[in-house]
Curated annotation (Swiss-Prot):
Keywords: Hydrolase, Serine esterase. It comes from the Bacteria. Gene3D superfamilies: alpha/beta hydrolase. Its EC number is 3.1.1.1. The keyword Transcription regulation does not apply. GO terms for molecular function: carboxylesterase activity. PANTHER family: DIENELACTONE HYDROLASE DOMAIN-CONTAINING PROTEIN-RELATED, ESTERASE FRSA. Catalyzes the hydrolysis of esters. This is Esterase FrsA. Pfam families: FrsA-like. It comes from Serratia proteamaculans (strain 568).
Length: 415
């Protein structure tokens, strides 16, 4: 009888999935820092996650809906794993971060299914994909509910491409020593294959499906294709952890582009966003014969990885993301920061050496994670470098103008 009761307890359906903020068990040594950044958004004292309405709106999410979802999470009077943080509701139910964003995505998915006009329906599917992606944010390894939301995002993203005026090719790439990964190749309506192509190197807290706006508004009008893959330990790259060889996955993809008929492998550039710049700049040194240029936005290549005063500005969630990607979920802050030092491209002996690959770097004044000196280091290391200063205000139009400049620069390098 006791055995039967034990089995009943063990196998009884449970709605208490692991809650996101509990997945990284770092021995924290400080009160979480505050951060206000254009690319990361803001830390708010009563939220675990950094709230990034600017970038979410840039991706296509209505700011009114963002506030509505955040309000539903904020008013939930149910069990939290940490009573200080509004977004730590236990279980998949009302008030839970993942539940509320998925719920909003489902509304858009239903509208997409009911829509007769293909262009409108495609946009509705994209809306759904964006909400599902935010549901999984910050995409920590082992977050079961987030992984389900990410699968929904991928499916909605693929459905959108069937209705909108571009082609999406799902490509599989072999990776030496382990599991293959899947990438999305976005082909523009303008021009003919093989296309000049931008290899996207995203930030550590985003999915490869989060960069559609970059393709639609900045690359496709120039007849440029975009190839995305997930960063290590996220999405289809789930089985790979981030190592000091940060460009490992992207480099293997780059070497296989000769086999992709839609890509002009002799006209390829890389675009690095935040930590993705670490990947892109590393590729500039390791694969100069395969890249026409590298563009970076708010790069993280040295200072944040080595400087203790800069690391003091890094909030818990961002450190959790780094620890999760590196497979160091149980490490202390001290051990994690010692390891981060080896991820610096200057420490590795790359940055500071002359690089033949053209490199562009854009920075914001007073960016706590990527100061001007970071971008200057990249530009001065290239034999053909260009520096872009991005005004802090007006935020949205400055971001837009910077992306326009960068897309024109990449187009010019791929002539």
């Amino acid at each position: 009888m006791a055995q039967a009761n034990l089995s009943e307890i063990l196998f009884k359906p449970s709605f208490k999935h692991p809650e996101t903020s509990t997945l990284v068990l770092r021995a924290r040594s400080k009160i979480s820092a505050e951060l206000h950044s254009t690319l990361e958004g803001n830390t708010v004292s009563n939220w675990y996650r950094m709230l990034n309405p600017l970038l979410w709106a840039w991706r296509g999410v209505d700011p009114i809906e963002i506030n509505e979802v955040l309000a539903r999470i904020a008013v939930a009077d149910v069990e939290h794993t940490n009573d200080k943080w509004l977004d730590t509701v236990v279980g998949y139910r009302n008030g839970n971060w993942i539940y509320e964003w998925v719920h909003q995505g489902m509304l858009w998915q239903q509208r997409a299914l009911e829509q007769q006009d293909p262009l409108t329906g495609g946009q509705y599917w994209l809306n759904a994909a964006n909400f599902y992606s935010i549901a999984g944010y910050p995409h920590l390894k082992g977050d079961e509910l987030a992984e389900q939301a990410e699968a929904l995002s991928n499916r909605a993203y693929e459905e959108a491409a069937l209705l909108l005026p571009y082609q999406l090719k799902e490509l599989e790439f072999r990776i030496e020593g382990g599991s293959s990964i899947t990438g999305f190749l976005h082909l523009p309506e303008k021009g003919e294959a093989p296309f000049p192509t931008v290899l996207m190197c995203g930030s550590l807290d985003t999915l490869q499906t989060d960069y559609h706006r970059l393709f639609r508004d900045y690359l496709a009008p120039h007849g440029i294709a975009m190839l995305t893959i997930d960063m290590p330990s996220i999405g289809s790259s789930y089985k790979w952890k981030l190592t000091q060889d940060s460009s490992f996955l992207h480099q293997q993809v780059l070497t296989q582009l000769t086999t992709v008929p839609w890509i002009d492998h002799q006209r390829v550039t890389a675009f690095g966003f935040r930590f993705g710049a670490n990947v892109a700049v590393r590729l500039a040194y390791l694969e100069p014969q395969r890249l026409r240029g590298v563009a970076c936005l708010g790069p993280v290549v040295h200072r944040l990885l080595c400087d203790s005063s800069t690391q003091k500005h890094v909030p818990d969630m961002y450190m959790d993301v780094l620890a999760s990607r590196m497979g160091m979920a149980n490490a202390s802050d001290h051990v994690l920061k010692v390891e981060l030092n080896s991820y610096s491209l200057k420490t590795q002996g790359l940055l500071g050496r002359r690089c033949p690959t053209p490199m562009l770097a854009g920075y914001w004044e007073q960016d706590p994670l990527s100061p001007k000196e970071e971008s200057q280091l990249i530009v001065s290391s290239s034999m053909d470098g260009k520096l872009i200063a991005i005004p802090r205000k007006p935020v949205y139009s400055s971001f837009h103008k910077a992306l326009l400049q960068m897309s024109h620069w990449m187009k010019d390098k791929m002539r």
